[in-house]
Design a protein with these regions (language model features):
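Conserved alpha-helical substructure of the radical SAM core
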Residues: 1-65, 69-71, 165-169, 177, ...
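Flexible loop residues that form catalytic
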Residues: 27, 56, 78, 153, ...
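Acidic-and-aromatic substrate-binding clefts and catalytic sites of carbohydrate-active enzymes
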Residues: 30-34, 57-60, 126-131, 199, ...
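Residue-level marker of regulatory loop/turn positions in helix-turn-helix DNA-binding domains and
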Residues: 32, 206, 255
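Flexible mid-to-C-terminal extensions adjoining Fe-S/redox cofactors in radical SAM and related proteins
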Residues: 199-202, 219-289
Length: 289
């Protein structure tokens, strides 16, 4: 874990340098950190827009004073019933109801406080859990979330990671749920057609310049997909501040000399292409809408 004082230092530097937003996320679970509410509150006090990606298993005393002030909170559930949840997460089946109850509490508090915080859920569809997708979405809608984000499993095998006809059946279950449950207060966001599997055919990775991923090991990485891998590592904050890291010539060289072609697959290809277009001094068809 990042020590609390170091986390505060990073946030202070980020705010001073003009960073606009921060996502508290994994790998790992942010709310396991004992002082996470203090860190969250400090980020808010600095004027940073904050968001949280959480498994929803933990709500510590005082969360009501912090989470409603976040821009969004998204809970990763990825299961339609307690047995599937226990199997995939390797935890007691009772945790599933705890998670759903916690999500319900957060949604209720956001509504009570008339907060603008958007509370949603994330659901990764796999060859193992797709059977209960319909029931899972129904349960999540009942908690009061505004949306559930349905995503495909990110695998270097692409569509081949779904054996037989499980891919088609997965998509069908998501569509069935969307047709049934979409209304003015709830949306099934279907992103299941975005399966990782495209190797970049360009060199410039613009995403690494816009989003900085700081791991729990205090290493800085190019993105969440290359986190905790040598390919993604861009130096460390263990012996320097975040501000020093940003101004470091070594950091600049590692960013400049990196080729996106080094990645076998990239889930951020479309974002990189947009960044390349926006930063191109002479983009094609710029005068046409």
């Amino acid at each position: 874990m990042i020590p609390k004082d170091k986390a505060i230092e990073i946030l202070d530097d980020a705010a001073k340098m003009g960073v606009k937003s921060i996502i508290f996320t994994g790998g790992g679970e942010p709310t396991v950190f004992p002082d996470h509410l203090e860190v969250f509150a400090h980020a808010l006090d600095l004027g940073l827009e904050c968001s949280l990606n959480s498994n929803g298993a933990i709500l510590r005393n005082g969360w009501q004073d912090v989470l409603p002030d976040f821009t969004y909170v998204r809970f990763s559930v990825d299961a339609g019933d307690a047995n599937q949840y226990a199997k995939d997460r390797r935890v007691s089946s009772s945790i599933y109801s705890t998670v759903l109850n916690n999500i319900t509490k957060v949604c209720a508090e956001v509504e009570r406080s008339k907060s603008d915080c958007v509370v949603g859920a994330g659901y990764v569809v796999t060859p193992d859990n797709y059977i209960h997708v319909y029931e899972g979405i129904a349960r999540l809608k009942h908690t009061g979330v505004e949306y559930v984000r349905m995503a495909a499993m990110q695998s270097t095998e692409g569509f081949d990671a779904y054996p037989g006809n499980t891919w088609e059946r997965s998509r069908a279950e998501v569509k069935r749920a969307k047709d049934k449950f979409d209304d003015d207060t709830f949306t099934v966001v279907d992103l299941t057609d975005n399966v990782m599997g495209a190797k970049p055919d360009y060199d410039f990775c613009g995403f690494q310049h816009f989003v900085t991923y700081i791991g729990a090991d205090l290493n800085v990485y190019r993105c969440c997909y290359t986190a905790y891998a040598d390919l993604g590592r861009i130096n460390s904050l263990k012996l320097q501040t975040f501000a020093q890291w940003v101004k470091s010539e070594s950091t600049r060289e590692l960013l400049t000399n990196f080729s996106a072609r080094s990645c076998d697959n990239c889930a951020l290809n479309e974002k990189n292409k947009v960044i390349m277009y926006l930063t191109d001094p002479d983009p094609k068809h710029v005068n046409f809408v």
